[in-house]
């Protein structure tokens, strides 16, 4: 299939990578798995046995007229433990490589279909100045954009770092969440070829 390039003639790309059907279920699974993998999972609270103290019972079992109490660290007491305390856990979800690649292909195909993929021959800035990059993006009418190249250019990365709705990634650093999070994805021809290699 043909893919239009902004500043050059159209290029021939793989139908498998850029022309497949959109599998919403698979993309959803990939996005959820990716975001779950980013969770720290280190939350921890103390149960009645974790709270320091409370070894000796506050008063005897019988004869006081008060409700029986075995420890001052009971969850119903002030200063006691938490009833269902949070424990550290691994939130990561298993996603086969084959499924991940299929989800990425599905996202790229949908970006092409909805005219959200802007292909350019090359994209770089001479100096690491935000003003220069902003001027370039304004000329292309891009405000909310992910810039993907085959390798991250240091000047480009530094220039984009302070822009709120602009991100720069290389092909290896692209993920399902970043690809669908922006209005447009600006991608270089070399990055397109790299995606074909990795996902083909």
From Swiss-Prot:
A single BP term in Gene Ontology: translation
Molecular-function annotations in GO: rRNA binding; structural constituent of ribosome
Paired cysteines (S-S): none
GO cellular component, as recorded: ribonucleoprotein complex; ribosome
Pfam families: Ribosomal_L4
Domain of life (superkingdom): Bacteria
SUPFAM superfamilies: Ribosomal protein L4 (SSF52166)
Signal peptide: none
Chain positions covered by the region annotation Disordered: 38-72
Entry keyword annotation includes rRNA-binding: yes
InterPro entries according to UniProt: Ribosomal_uL4, Ribosomal_uL4-like, Ribosomal_uL4_dom_sf
Keyword list, A-Z: Ribonucleoprotein, Ribosomal protein, RNA-binding, rRNA-binding
Record note on quaternary structure: Part of the 50S ribosomal subunit.
Annotated HAMAP family: Ribosomal_uL4_B
Protein family: Belongs to the universal ribosomal protein uL4 family.
NCBIfam families xref list: rplD_bact
Function field: One of the primary rRNA binding proteins, this protein initially binds near the 5'-end of the 23S rRNA. It is important during the early stages of 50S assembly. It makes multiple contacts with different domains of the 23S rRNA in the assembled 50S subunit and ribosome.
The name this protein goes by in its record: Large ribosomal subunit protein uL4
Gene: rplD
């Amino acid at each position: 299939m043909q893919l239009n390039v902004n500043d050059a003639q159209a290029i021939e790309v793989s139908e498998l990578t850029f022309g497949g059907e959109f599998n919403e279920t698979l993309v959803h699974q990939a996005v959820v798995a990716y975001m779950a993998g980013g969770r720290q999972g280190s939350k921890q609270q103390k149960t009645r046995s974790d709270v320091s103290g409370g070894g000796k019972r506050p008063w005897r079992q019988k004869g006081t007229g008060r409700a029986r109490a075995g420890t001052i660290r009971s969850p119903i007491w002030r200063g006691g433990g938490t009833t269902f305390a949070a424990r550290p856990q691994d939130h990561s979800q298993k996603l086969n490589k084959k499924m991940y690649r299929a989800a990425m292909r599905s996202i790229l195909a949908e970006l092409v279909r909805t005219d959200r993929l802007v292909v350019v021959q090359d994209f770089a800035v001479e100096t690491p100045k935000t003003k220069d990059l902003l001027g370039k993006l304004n000329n292309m009418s891009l405000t909310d954009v992910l810039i993907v190249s085959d390798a991250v250019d240091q000047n480009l990365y530094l220039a984009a770092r302070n822009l709120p709705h602009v991100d720069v990634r290389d092909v290896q650093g692209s993920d399902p969440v970043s690809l669908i999070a922006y209005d447009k994805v600006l991608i270089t021809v070399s990055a397109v070829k790299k995606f074909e290699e990795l996902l083909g």
